[in-house]
Amino acid sequence: MNIWLSMLTTTGLGAIIGGFTNHLAIKMLFRPHRPMYIGKFQVPFTPGLIPKRRDELAVQLGKMVVEHLLTPEGIGKKLTNEEFQKGLIHWAQVEVDKVITNEQSLRHMLGKWDVAHVEKEATEKIEQVITEKIQAFLEEYYTYTWEQALPHSVHEKIENAIPNVSAFILKRAIHFFESEEGKSRLSRMIDDFFASRGALLNLVGMFLGNVSVVDRVQPEVIKFLGQDGTKQLLTDVLQKEWEKLKGRDVKELETFVEKEMIVSSILSAVKVEETVSKFLNQSVQQVCEPVRETIIEKVVPNAVTKGLKWGGENVESILNNLHLAEIVQQEVSTFSTERLEDLVLSITKNELKMITYLGALLGGMIGIVQGLLLLFLK
């Protein structure tokens, strides 16, 4: 009976010692958090292993993340994964659709993003671009003649329009001289003509008798204006003037209208500020609705695909520029010892318990062996 009690005792003591030893060893990985002293002498094994080696641990964790976890090959493989790409495209489509179907005004959205000043800047930039384009256009075209400056199609239209212009002018002239206003104007012109020629007026009066000069001249003027020869004459005159104009420099226009006036007139006609303001007062949905389907079905997938392709091709450079090892090292270095302990235990809690149990099991087995040895020795 004493023998079995001895074996049970040695087994129990072995299990307790083995389990406690392993438990103590695990605790000493983290505890104590700070060095302990007896007088001026530091107690051995203080602080614990992990608190003592925290900086080295931070460096090694950083290397481990970069060299074994977040590797360029692993990330590149993920970026080219078809299922991942489909999921990302779908997510992007949903998020973009939320934005472009927003009923808030563009002005309100810009205010939320703290870029409300964009209206003023956009107006100034558009006016600047228009001004620069007009000035560049004028600088170039001022070196040309009108024949060089105007497109061939414009030349043809003008030349084809000259006979019609002649007919229009003559038609309006006939209509004018047939009116009372035209007759009155013609009468004054005749009176002015004969005012300094008194004898000639008397001579004409002898021939015309009681009929006024204007009554005789008016039908003739109208008849002259209605003749085909007159139309051809006016057409020839306009054609000659057009030929002269084609040979003149566009720069001569500056004599009548300065560049600044041209620019100012165009800017006033365009009304940039008013146009920008109206545009910003529209809702995001109003602006994007005409191209919504194109954005969702084409632009977003293409953008995501090209972005992922670029990311896959440059992943190594991106990771190098991110300095992930340094980031991990800095973050771990900022952890308190308590937090670091909780972090490690949250991952290895079950395994550390099994190590404690294993120590107890081995201690118990050693106790049994000791009991058997005592039995044989007796």
Curated annotation (Swiss-Prot):
InterPro entries documented for this protein: DUF445 (IPR007383), UCP032178 (IPR016991)
Segments passing through the bilayer: 1-21, 357-377
Keywords annotated in UniProt: Cell membrane, Membrane, Transmembrane, Transmembrane helix
GO cellular component: a single term: plasma membrane
Top-level division of the source organism's lineage: Bacteria
Keyword Cell membrane part of the UniProt annotation: yes
Membrane topology: Multi-pass membrane protein
Lineage: Bacteria, Bacillati, Bacillota, Bacilli, Bacillales
Name this protein carries in UniProt: UPF0754 membrane protein BA_0862/GBAA_0862/BAS0819
Pfam families found in the cross-reference section: DUF445
Subcellular location: Cell membrane
Keyword match Secreted: no
Family: Belongs to the UPF0754 family.
Principal location class: membrane
